[in-house]
Amino acid sequence: MSAHTDRRHHVQSGLMRESLVDKSVIRSTETPVVRMLPEAHVVKIGGRSVLDAGRGVVYPVIETLARILATKKLILGVGGGVRTRHVFSIGLDLGLPTGVLAQLSAADANGNAHILGTLLAPYGVVAIPPEMFGHLLPLFIHAAPGVIFNGMPPYSLWEHPPGLGRIPPHRTDAGCFLLAECFGCKSLVLVKDVDGVYDKDPKDHAGASLIREISATELERRALPSLPFDRVLLRLLGTARLLKKFQVVNGHRPELIEAAINGKHVGSIVFAG
């Protein structure tokens, strides 16, 4: 059939005949990204840092979150805490691969998500099952003041092998970061049991100095032996398009969570660069 009589619609696609491993082609895909949930805040509640600490720590955090939820939209991620560490110990002893460890830790984090959801249920916030969370998040966040998820990115069996050891590198801090980046959220706050990032582990060194603000590049260069968040966040900050910083605050001082959500510098800020 000649070009003059062919009435079929032909879709023009810039990538149709291109190799997706060609660097020049990949460079051409650097285009603006839409922010799907620009007014929502992602807050990671540490499993070991907060939930495992018991009623005396958890209830004041719940009261603070309830107060924030009256005016802000929150996406709450939760870690697996001590149960995940126990499962890791068993799995490592049995020779389980990294992907299986990631799958098991997601189950522990999911349990903590339901605990947090039970405590926040009076405020209209519940835990959403991971299989539907990502697809329906915009609906949930517009229908309720906040939602809770298990924090684990769904790499599961496809988790990346770490450079050292077998612990999954993308854990709940990374999952919360990636969610905030994908949906273009307003901020990411990591709630821990320390005041922020220190030059040494403050639990072992009384004279450790708090680092109030630092770039991901500088933090990587320093190669500190201990960080209060997943180390892979430093690499993720370097490639993120929408999320350019996060703040680490102490959940044992719950008023700092609200201050951080309101844009105040009350912990350690790690920024891209």
What function would you assign to each model-found segment?
Residues 2-273:
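C-terminal catalytic "cap/lid" subdomain
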